[in-house]
Amino acid sequence: MPSNVSSAERPTFPKRAVITGGMPYGNKNLHFGHIGGVFVPADFFARFLRDRIGSQNVVFVSGTDCYGSPIMEGYRKKVEGEGYDGSIVDYVSANHEAQLQALEAYGISLDLFAGSGLEPA
Protein backbone atom coordinates (compact mmCIF):
# COMPACT_ATOMS: atom_id res chain seq x y z
CA MET A 1 0.00 0.00 0.00
CA PRO A 2 1.69 3.24 -1.10
CA SER A 3 2.14 6.01 1.40
CA ASN A 4 1.13 9.58 0.63
CA VAL A 5 3.56 10.96 3.21
CA SER A 6 6.66 12.48 1.72
CA SER A 7 9.93 12.71 3.61
CA ALA A 8 9.45 16.50 3.82
CA GLU A 9 6.37 15.95 5.99
CA ARG A 10 8.19 13.80 8.54
CA PRO A 11 8.74 15.45 11.91
CA THR A 12 12.02 17.19 12.46
CA PHE A 13 13.70 17.42 15.82
CA PRO A 14 15.97 20.09 17.25
CA LYS A 15 19.70 19.40 17.56
CA ARG A 16 19.61 20.34 21.24
CA ALA A 17 16.83 20.98 23.74
CA VAL A 18 16.27 22.41 27.20
CA ILE A 19 13.14 21.10 28.91
CA THR A 20 11.85 22.97 31.94
CA GLY A 21 9.38 22.05 34.63
CA GLY A 22 7.54 24.83 36.44
CA MET A 23 9.25 25.77 39.68
CA PRO A 24 7.11 25.00 42.74
CA TYR A 25 7.26 27.38 45.70
CA GLY A 26 9.57 26.33 48.51
CA ASN A 27 6.87 26.54 51.17
CA LYS A 28 5.96 22.83 51.25
CA ASN A 29 6.53 19.46 49.64
CA LEU A 30 5.11 18.59 46.24
CA HIS A 31 1.51 17.47 45.77
CA PHE A 32 -0.04 15.37 43.01
CA GLY A 33 -0.70 18.43 40.83
CA HIS A 34 3.01 19.19 40.76
CA ILE A 35 4.06 15.61 40.04
CA GLY A 36 1.30 14.61 37.62
CA GLY A 37 0.55 17.99 36.10
CA VAL A 38 4.02 19.45 35.64
CA PHE A 39 6.83 16.96 36.10
CA VAL A 40 5.47 13.77 34.50
CA PRO A 41 4.62 15.45 31.15
CA ALA A 42 7.97 17.30 31.08
CA ASP A 43 9.81 14.09 32.01
CA PHE A 44 7.98 12.19 29.28
CA PHE A 45 9.01 14.79 26.70
CA ALA A 46 12.62 14.89 27.94
CA ARG A 47 12.88 11.09 27.71
CA PHE A 48 11.32 11.14 24.23
CA LEU A 49 13.82 13.73 22.99
CA ARG A 50 16.75 11.92 24.62
CA ASP A 51 15.72 8.86 22.62
CA ARG A 52 15.48 10.83 19.37
CA ILE A 53 18.43 13.26 19.54
CA GLY A 54 20.64 11.70 22.20
CA SER A 55 20.77 12.18 25.94
CA GLN A 56 23.84 14.42 25.68
CA ASN A 57 21.72 16.92 23.70
CA VAL A 58 18.82 17.25 26.17
CA VAL A 59 18.87 19.03 29.52
CA PHE A 60 15.86 18.79 31.84
CA VAL A 61 15.89 21.46 34.55
CA SER A 62 13.67 22.79 37.29
CA GLY A 63 13.98 23.90 40.86
CA THR A 64 12.43 25.43 43.91
CA ASP A 65 11.12 28.99 43.67
CA CYS A 66 12.56 30.52 46.84
CA TYR A 67 10.77 33.86 46.66
CA GLY A 68 7.18 35.02 47.11
CA SER A 69 4.44 35.58 49.63
CA PRO A 70 3.52 31.85 49.98
CA ILE A 71 6.98 31.22 51.41
CA MET A 72 6.83 34.17 53.79
CA GLU A 73 3.37 33.12 54.98
CA GLY A 74 4.32 29.45 55.37
CA TYR A 75 7.42 30.43 57.33
CA ARG A 76 5.40 32.80 59.56
CA LYS A 77 2.85 30.07 60.32
CA LYS A 78 5.59 27.57 61.13
CA VAL A 79 7.35 30.02 63.48
CA GLU A 80 4.18 31.22 65.22
CA GLY A 81 2.23 27.97 65.19
CA GLU A 82 4.91 25.34 65.67
CA GLY A 83 7.69 27.29 67.35
CA TYR A 84 10.08 26.74 64.46
CA ASP A 85 13.40 28.41 65.31
CA GLY A 86 15.31 28.07 62.03
CA SER A 87 15.89 30.83 59.52
CA ILE A 88 13.78 31.27 56.42
CA VAL A 89 16.72 29.91 54.39
CA ASP A 90 16.69 26.77 56.57
CA TYR A 91 12.92 26.49 56.02
CA VAL A 92 13.21 26.76 52.23
CA SER A 93 16.25 24.46 52.10
CA ALA A 94 14.40 21.74 54.00
CA ASN A 95 11.41 22.02 51.64
CA HIS A 96 13.74 22.00 48.63
CA GLU A 97 15.31 18.74 49.83
CA ALA A 98 11.86 17.22 50.43
CA GLN A 99 10.81 18.21 46.89
CA LEU A 100 13.97 16.68 45.43
CA GLN A 101 13.38 13.43 47.33
CA ALA A 102 9.79 13.29 46.06
CA LEU A 103 10.94 13.73 42.46
CA GLU A 104 13.58 11.04 42.89
CA ALA A 105 10.98 8.69 44.43
CA TYR A 106 8.82 9.09 41.30
CA GLY A 107 11.81 8.54 39.01
CA ILE A 108 11.66 11.97 37.39
CA SER A 109 14.80 12.26 35.23
CA LEU A 110 15.89 15.82 36.02
CA ASP A 111 19.43 16.83 35.15
CA LEU A 112 19.29 19.79 37.55
CA PHE A 113 16.93 20.68 40.40
CA ALA A 114 18.22 23.90 41.92
CA GLY A 115 16.80 26.67 44.06
CA SER A 116 16.37 30.27 42.91
CA GLY A 117 17.61 31.61 46.25
CA LEU A 118 19.90 28.80 47.35
CA GLU A 119 23.61 28.29 46.83
CA PRO A 120 24.56 27.32 43.26
CA ALA A 121 24.08 23.66 42.38
Predicted regions and their residues:
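N-terminal, positively charged nucleic-acid-binding surface of large information/translation enzymes
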Residues: 2-121
